[in-house]
């Protein structure tokens, strides 16, 4: 199925590209998320008329994402207190929601879906590097310090 991309999609293309994808991927993911429209003659003409407007909107979204990433990087460290045993093992774990809540409480709005934990949830006290994917092209880093209550 031919679609026109309205946003940058990983491993597929960027704004304005006409790509061929499986019908289910287009129907169930790309179109409902607003990342693509079917490449009909009417949609192609409509897209070409609005191309500059869409590119400007995409640039604004990218600039806003960069600004948020700078704010996250400026925080440097966020401290989270949790119950822990004598050897530094936590009772439970600290996941994406806990980290997102702590960063939001520190003054930067972050969704839990933007938090990336490559090694899984945090289960020990100490300092941990946490990545944030604010936009498909914009990443930020933050140190989370887990202390025992």
Swiss-Prot record:
GO MF annotations in UniProt: rRNA binding; structural constituent of ribosome
Record carries keyword RNA-binding: yes
GO cellular component: ribonucleoprotein complex; ribosome
Coiled coil: none
PANTHER family hit by this protein: 50S RIBOSOMAL PROTEIN L9
NCBIfam families noted in UniProt: L9
HAMAP family: Ribosomal_bL9
Protein's recorded name: Large ribosomal subunit protein bL9
Lineage of source species: Bacteria, Pseudomonadati, Pseudomonadota, Gammaproteobacteria, Enterobacterales
């Amino acid at each position: 199925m031919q679609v026109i991309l309205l946003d940058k999609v990983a491993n597929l293309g960027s704004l304005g590209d006409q790509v061929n994808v499986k019908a289910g991927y287009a129907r169930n993911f790309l179109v409902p998320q607003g990342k693509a429209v079917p490449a009909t003659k009417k949609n192609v003409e409509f897209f070409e008329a609005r191309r500059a407007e869409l590119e400007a909107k995409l640039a604004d979204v990218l600039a806003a994402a960069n600004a948020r990433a700078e704010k996250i990087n400026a925080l440097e460290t966020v401290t989270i207190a949790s119950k822990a045993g004598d050897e530094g093992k936590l009772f439970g774990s600290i996941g994406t929601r806990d980290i997102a809540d702590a960063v939001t409480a520190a003054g930067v709005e972050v969704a839990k879906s933007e938090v990336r934990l490559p090694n899984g949830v945090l289960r020990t006290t100490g300092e941990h590097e946490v990545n944030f994917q604010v936009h498909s092209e914009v990443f930020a880093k933050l140190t989370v310090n887990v202390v025992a209550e």
